[in-house]
Design a protein with these regions (language model features):
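Immediate post-signal-peptide N-terminus of mature secreted/exported proteins
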Residues: 20-64, 128-132
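Bacterial N-terminal signal peptides
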Residues: 8-16
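Compositionally biased non-globular segments, especially hydrophobic aliphatic-rich helices
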Residues: 15, 25-26, 38, 96, ...
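Sec-dependent signal peptide recognition
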Residues: 2-8
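Amphipathic alpha-helical binding modules
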Residues: 109-132
C-alpha cells in the first residue's frame, strides 16, 4: 500500500501544473524558429488573463516565467545574438504588466522584479555556455 501511495505522489509531482501546461501550449510555434515578438505578446496576454481572472497565483506566474526563459533558450540556440535584447524588452513588458495588475501590493512587485533580475543573470550564463 505504501508503495502505491509513494508512486502516486511521484507521478503527481512530475505532471506539470495547469498554468505551466497553458504556458507551453500558448507558446507553441511552427518549426524550431521562435518569433520573439509572438512569445512576448502571447506570454503577456496569458499572464494578464490568468491574473485578472484570479486563476494563477504569483508562484504559478513565476513558474511560467522560468518556463518561458527555458523555452526561449532551447529554441534559439543557433541564433543567440538577439536573445539578450529580446529578454530585456520582454522583462520590461512583463514589469509593466505586473505593476498594472498588482499596484496595490508593492512587496509583490519588488519580489517579482528581484526574481526577474536573477532569471536574467542565469539566462546570460546559459547563453554564454551555448555560444562557446
Amino acid at each position: 500500500m505504501k508503495k502505491i501511495i509513494v508512486t502516486s505522489l511521484l507521478i503527481a509531482l512530475l505532471i506539470p501544473s495547469a498554468p505551466v501546461q497553458a504556458a507551453t501550449k500558448s507558446l507553441n510555434t511552427k518549426g524550431n524558429k521562435v518569433s520573439c515578438k509572438n512569445i512576448k505578446t502571447k506570454y503577456a496576454s496569458e499572464v494578464m488573463l490568468r491574473w485578472s481572472n484570479g486563476l494563477a497565483s504569483d508562484e504559478d506566474v513565476f513558474k511560467e516565467i522560468d518556463l518561458n526563459i527555458d523555452m526561449l533558450a532551447e529554441k534559439q540556440k543557433p541564433t543567440t545574438g538577439k536573445i539578450k535584447k529580446t529578454i530585456d524588452s520582454w522583462i520590461t513588458a512583463e514589469k509593466n504588466t505586473k505593476i498594472a495588475l498588482t499596484s496595490k501590493n508593492v512587496e509583490a512587485i519588488t519580489a517579482a522584479m528581484n526574481l526577474k533580475i536573477l532569471s536574467i543573470a542565469n539566462f546570460d550564463k546559459m547563453c554564454k555556455s551555448i555560444t562557446k
